């Protein structure tokens, strides 16, 4: 188990000393590089979704990463579709990029969806491709109960990255938000980027945006409408609101 909690820690000191406490408590490594430097803790980690989203396609992102870190290539395979895109592209990189260099794919990481099911399917795909030594790392709001459940389900997971449930206490919870690339500027043009996920709430809205805030007759804010940068919203009449997490829920504002 590795400490992945820095971005959800309450401040920098909490991230650094929390990593130290995690290792004292049994974690084998941390993704917080500063803690590794200060306390001689083994450092481990994988790529971020932003790395994958920056490039035009997933294979190119994996290839660039593998060439940069050939001895420690762990690929994050859930940016778009784990079983139909992520794992197949990881296998392709292992065969076409790493093996010609005399290297092996160290691992893949699952960060959303049904981790037990996906890990079993991914394990079979890797084994069938001759990558039985490729490890599977799992993360996504894990705690001791979730990990115990995954083990009981026979999940094919070799290691766990635990963040917010390790580095913060339940009495002082974290704000559940993420920061993803929405667009990449190329020659003055903003090219939209999207994060697809097995968890609907993790799917991002691509492109440069603007926000309209809706107030009621008592001047109380009741909704925010998200629109594209060049999209014009007619505010003199009715405006339809669609809940991004529950698209079947619609509401009209005037």
Feature names for model-found ranges:
Residues 44, 108, 136, 158-160:
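Hydrophobic residues within beta-strands of alpha/beta enzymes
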Residues 139:
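Short hydrophobic "strand-cap" motifs at the C-terminus of beta-strands
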Residues 1-131, 142-146, 152, 187:
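Buried, small/hydrophobic-residue-enriched core segments of structured protein domains
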């Amino acid at each position: 188990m590795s400490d992945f909690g820095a971005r959800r820690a309450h401040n920098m000191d909490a991230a650094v000393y929390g990593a130290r406490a995690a290792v004292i408590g049994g974690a084998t490594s941390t993704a917080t590089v500063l803690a590794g430097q200060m306390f001689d803790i083994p450092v481990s980690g994988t790529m971020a979704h932003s790395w994958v989203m920056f490039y035009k396609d997933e294979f190119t992102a994996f290839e660039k990463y593998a060439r940069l870190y050939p001895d420690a290539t762990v690929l994050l395979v859930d940016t778009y579709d784990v079983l139909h895109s992520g794992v197949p592209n990881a296998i392709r990189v292992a065969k076409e990029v790493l093996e010609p260099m005399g290297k092996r794919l160290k691992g893949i990481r699952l960060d959303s969806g049904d981790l037990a099911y996906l890990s079993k399917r991914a394990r079979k795909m890797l084994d069938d491709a001759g990558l039985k030594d490729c490890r599977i790392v799992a993360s996504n709001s894990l705690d001791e109960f979730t990990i115990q459940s995954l083990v009981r389900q026979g999940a094919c997971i070799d290691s766990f990255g635990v963040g917010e449930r390790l580095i913060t206490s339940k009495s002082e919870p974290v704000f559940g938000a993420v920061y993803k690339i929405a667009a990449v500027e190329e020659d003055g043009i903003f090219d939209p980027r999207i994060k697809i996920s097995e968890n609907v709430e993790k799917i991002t809205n691509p492109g440069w945006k603007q926000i309209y805030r809706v107030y009621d007759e008592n001047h109380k804010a009741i909704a925010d409408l998200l629109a594209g940068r060049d999209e014009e919203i007619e505010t003199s009449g009715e405006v339809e609101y669609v809940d991004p997490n529950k698209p079947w829920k619609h509401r009209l504002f005037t």
